[in-house]
Amino acid sequence: MRVERCLIDANWGASTEVVYQFCRHSEFAAVLTPSHGRYVGAASLPFSEYRRHPGDRVGHNWRIPAAANGRAVRHLVYDTNYWKSFVHTRLAVPLGETGGLSLFGEKAEAHRQFADHLTAEYRVKTEGRGRTVDEWRVRPGGGDNHWFDGLVGCAVAASMQGVALLEHAPAPAPKPPPRKLSDVQKQKRLEREQRGGYYGL
């Protein structure tokens, strides 16, 4: 399997510049993207209402702002609450159903540590600004959640590469109506006349 997109968390202030430098100078710079998860709660401005600026790339609850601050590397910003809910919803889909995410094998113990990371946070339904969102919080005394963050990043990276659930996929472009042979011949005749010669069909 070829890796087409790899996000690297650049949110931790002490390592932000190191992440940007690595992404800029790596031999894999074409697939590396510094990423910043943003907590978008019920009272926050949702990603769908951000004002788009020239050069921005906007996707499903993520965006890549135009390059700024003298940085040669563009970065990704995504709604962590939305994407954490997205991942947990995928895990809750019954095995074999469309849109599900499952783990390999039959031995639950093989995935215990991974499951601990995925359950180190819990969601709280919160209302504000006329909408209801899940806000994710770390469990009191909860353990590490790094692999949960990593899985969320994988889902966002897949979205960047065009992977989408059917309900989130962009509508296909309409097909042009079929052309009659006589119309094609007429168009070719006109093009030849404009180039300075008419030879008939």
Q: Which sequence ranges carry the predicted segments?
A:
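Mg2+-dependent endonuclease catalytic cores in nucleic-acid-processing enzymes, primarily RNase H-like
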Residues: 1-130, 161, 173-201
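Extracellular low-complexity, Gly/Ser/Thr-rich intrinsically disordered linkers
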Residues: 115-166
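Mixed-charge, glycine-rich, non-catalytic linkers/tails in nucleic-acid processing enzymes
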Residues: 165-173
